[in-house]
């Protein structure tokens, strides 16, 4: 018999039903479960696949550069970043009639094009790229890196180049390498690029390899570095009248602490950014020399953890046993990595708009909205993944004997308290927030809007005031003009910060009121509920009150009938599945809030948000309905415009989303009946019955149907909102 898919599981390969295909796809990446896998092989496979991942990333970014250089308008955009629309790539579509061709021919292009809302143009411009040739050079370099990564991946699968398990479990060496070698050196290299290429570029000086050694980034060269007069590098910064990309109003400083924004570009000062990266480089280069490797000096992580037992004994054996537990569990490590990355990605979303780092990106409203939404959704998926792998850790890798009475075991011991507290918080937030919204709706519906319950967020306003926002009149800390912190700030640190925070033209510490108070608590409800489901799923992964023996059932067991007391909806996978809906729900509220707040701000009528966001009909009517009106007129009986493709995607997104429910609101028997009916009809239909298949068609399992439903729900949800967001923003602001 020929080798059938999947080769990694002989048991599945011999399955006579279509289950073979679906289970094969589902477990293709679950290396641990494959036939003949060893711990060593597992680590080596994952390690080699990382290089493949890098190759894909480099190829993708190379493609971005290449297509903009080939089909974009980078050089004309550079001449006038505020009025030329950046082109991502051309559209070649044989289905476009003349009206569509005309509608999508924009940005000075000769034919239909896609406009770029990625912020790449602004980034490339800020870091010193100016010509298409620069973009082609970057694309070729990344293509070269992609090839190198593929070769490295292949190489590390060859017997001579496969690292041993001990190499993978050498935590100190890995930490030193990542901290110093990756973060430290790359931050230092980036500082070098900013100082030698980007900052001169922002002052009208074109530095490339041919003149790299002739142009001094700072008039004094390296002198101040060696004589300890580092403050000379901060002297003579760019003036407030500096025109970015020219020498007009330019200074000579390279490392500054100005604070605030460049008045023309509305982005952080490049010299501040360079200073930040230099500081980061220093911190990480030091951090990468802290752990004990070759010379017997420095910290041992195991010793650190073992010694870390708080006095008083209230935390039991604290961190004893944790080192081996983490170091021997890939899922624990992946969970930690995903949790960290998820938080960082969400922080990127928050900081990209409030402290825009790239020149002119703050004035490109659609890009701001797209980047915020993009990073928040990605953060949501990554964070739910962290808990999924936390649950798999408990099932596959957790050993109670090794972790007796340490912090991990104690988390499991008091999981009931954790779940009940999260449950209480979610219920409290949900009922009170909904109660306030509904009350306000009733008051408006009954014609007594003055009876709404409107709560000022005074604590949040006080925090904003403490950071320097004066409009609330709190007169505290940095908003107190005669306080020592305020006066020191004038000269000592970030003098531009207080000006920026009190200007109304940016998104720093937006003015907040009762509408913000309510939506803040709605988002808090979503966050707490998502967390409750995820934490419960992980803590109950090995066993719960109803089913104390889940270990051998694994991560994603389906319903097993009523015989065992019912196993429906109690696998760790079920918790992850439910949590993704809540995560999408929450990020929906987050992005609705951000977008509505900002479009009213950008249009100069923040009172619309302030007045309409205190009741549910306001959100539905004045945000969703009002802002989709332009979008759904992208095509109509009178013709088509440049929003038509987004209008079509809006419709298509709803369709995909709704398809999800067909898979979610059904059960296994339904699918089996459907498939038997289809197979019966097929076998009795002339011509069609000439086509046979080897595998007997069996129904999707409950878990599979839910996965298909979840995938459609998620993809449709994101397609729908992406189309709405981009079309409603670009339709208003061009």
From Swiss-Prot:
Cofactor binding note: P700 is a chlorophyll a/chlorophyll a' dimer, A0 is one or more chlorophyll a, A1 is one or both phylloquinones and FX is a shared 4Fe-4S iron-sulfur center.
Enzymatic reactions: reduced [plastocyanin] + hnu + oxidized [2Fe-2S]-[ferredoxin] = oxidized [plastocyanin] + reduced [2Fe-2S]-[ferredoxin]
Recorded topology in the membrane: Multi-pass membrane protein
Alphabetical list of Pfam families matching this protein: PsaA_PsaB
TM stretches of this protein: 46-69, 135-158, 175-199, 273-291, 330-353, 369-395, 417-439, 517-535, 575-596, 643-665, 707-727
Protein EC: 1.97.1.12
GO terms classed as biological process: photosynthesis
Database matches in SUPFAM superfamilies: Photosystem I subunits PsaA/PsaB
Location in the cell: Plastid, Chloroplast thylakoid membrane
Matching HAMAP family: PSI_PsaB
Family the entry assigns: Belongs to the PsaA/PsaB family.
Free-text function comment from the UniProt entry: PsaA and PsaB bind P700, the primary electron donor of photosystem I (PSI), as well as the electron acceptors A0, A1 and FX. PSI is a plastocyanin-ferredoxin oxidoreductase, converting photonic excitation into a charge separation, which transfers an electron from the donor P700 chlorophyll pair to the spectroscopically characterized acceptors A0, A1, FX, FA and FB in turn. Oxidized P700 is reduced on the lumenal side of the thylakoid membrane by plastocyanin.
Record-given protein name: Photosystem I P700 chlorophyll a apoprotein A2
